[in-house]
Amino acid sequence: MDPFKVDFGSLQWQEPLPGLRFKVHRLGGKQLRLVELTSVFVEPQWCEKGHIGVVLDGTLEIDFRGRLVSYPEGTGIFIPPGPVSGHKARSLTPVVRLVLVEDA
């Protein structure tokens, strides 16, 4: 196994909430997540974590406390951590797939 290569095919899906599943690889205080949201997913609370990533498939909508921003396929995401950038995500398409780099 190459420590600098992430084989998402060998990782198990984690499904913490209905409509949300992800595969995660952690290394050195960071994590790389392959995330899949469906239109069933409802984020239960405001997230204040930072996220950097890209939408691979579908269209993601992020609610920044009343300001809605759409992220179609191929769009990058750069959300700094903290209450000012508090957000909730949802899928505008049946499925959204994205990759996120985050603090572990």
Where are the regions that the model predicts?
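Conserved short histidine dyad/triad with adjacent acidic residue
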Residues: 27-47, 81-82
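Short strand-coil-strand connectors
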Residues: 28, 63-67, 92
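A short, N-terminal "cap"/entry segment at the start of jelly-roll beta-barrel domains
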Residues: 1-35
